[in-house]
């Protein structure tokens, strides 16, 4: 798999999946997608959150807490991909106490959450599975 270098900012989840030729939900591998867009996934103990992303230019690292359930880990990686797609180059810090409050940080988290949902359950595939 060849990396996109650099990945366009605000690339939609559907466009990203299409560029990878992914047409089946079972083929959505968030770690492979992360690698494709210039990110590495590392598991390490995090005290204040379940996942975080740090980057410079077009490369970065998603750190994810290894003690969470696999489904939560998958969503956390997808959510950090949302930050990469929408907020790359910005300094954004979110604490656990920020979640659920109306603030600029909350809007940033909502955008990343929506990106993760659209990446993991793209409507084009999800609607077929629902029939």
Regions found by a protein language model. Give the residues of each.
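Active-site hotspot residues in diverse enzymes, especially metal/ion-binding acidic/histidine motifs
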Residues: 1-131
């Amino acid at each position: 798999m060849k990396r996109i270098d650099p990945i366009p900012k605000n690339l939609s989840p559907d466009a990203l999946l299409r560029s990878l030729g992914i047409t089946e939900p079972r083929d959505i591998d968030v770690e492979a997608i992360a690698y494709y867009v210039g990110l590495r996934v590392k598991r390490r103990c995090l005290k204040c959150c379940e996942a975080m992303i740090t980057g410079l230019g077009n490369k970065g690292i998603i750190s994810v807490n290894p003690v969470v359930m696999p489904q939560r880990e998958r969503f956390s990686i997808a959510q950090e991909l949302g930050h990469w797609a929408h907020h790359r180059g910005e300094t954004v810090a979110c604490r656990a106490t920020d979640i659920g409050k109306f603030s600029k940080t909350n809007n940033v988290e909502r955008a990343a959450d929506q990106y993760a949902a659209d990446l993991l359950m793209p409507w084009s595939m999800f609607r077929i599975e629902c029939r």
